[in-house]
C-alpha cells in the first residue's frame, strides 16, 4: 500500500497546532491561578472552571475554528490557547453563573 505523504504531513501539522493550543491554554490558566481540579464535591456535578475542564476543550475548539477560518498558523494556535484560558477564567463574568 502506498500512503500519500502529504496527508501524513497535514495530519502532523494539525496535531502540532492542537498541542500548541493545549499547552498554551494550560500555562495561561496556571498564570491566571485557575484551580487544577474543581474544589466542589462531587467533581462530576461541579460547574466550577478548572485547568482540566473546560480550559483545554475551549482552546481546542477555538483552534479548530481559527484553523478553518484563517489557515494553519502557529501564532493562531497560540492565540487560541490564550483565548481558551481567558474565556474559561472569565466565563462567569461574561455569561453569568449557572
Curated annotation (Swiss-Prot):
Q: Does the keyword Membrane apply?
A: yes
What is the membrane topology listed in the Swiss-Prot or TrEMBL record?
Answer: Multi-pass membrane protein
Q: Where does this one sit in the cell?
A: Cell membrane
* GO cellular component term, pick one: plasma membrane
| Statement: the UniProt record of this protein carries the keyword Transmembrane | yes
Among InterPro entries, the record links this protein to: Prd_NiFe_hyd_3_EhaA (IPR011306)
Query: Which regions span the lipid bilayer?
Result: 11-31, 46-66, 68-88
| This protein's UniProt keywords | Cell membrane, Membrane, Transmembrane, Transmembrane helix
- Report the function annotation for this chain: One of the integral membrane subunits of multisubunit membrane-bound [NiFe]-hydrogenase eha. Eha is predicted to form large electron transfer complex and might catalyze energy-driven reduction of low-potential redox carriers.
What the record says about family reads: Belongs to the EhaA family.
* Record's subunit section: Putative multisubunit membrane-bound [NiFe]-hydrogenase eha is composed of at least 20 subunits.
Q: What is this protein called?
A: Probable [NiFe]-hydrogenase-type-3 Eha complex membrane subunit A
Recorded source organism is Methanocaldococcus jannaschii (strain ATCC 43067 / DSM 2661 / JAL-1 / JCM 10045 / NBRC 100440) (Methanococcus jannaschii)
Task: Give the classification, highest ranks.
Answer: Archaea, Methanobacteriati, Methanobacteriota, Methanomada group, Methanococci
User: Which gene name belongs to this protein?
Assistant: ehaA
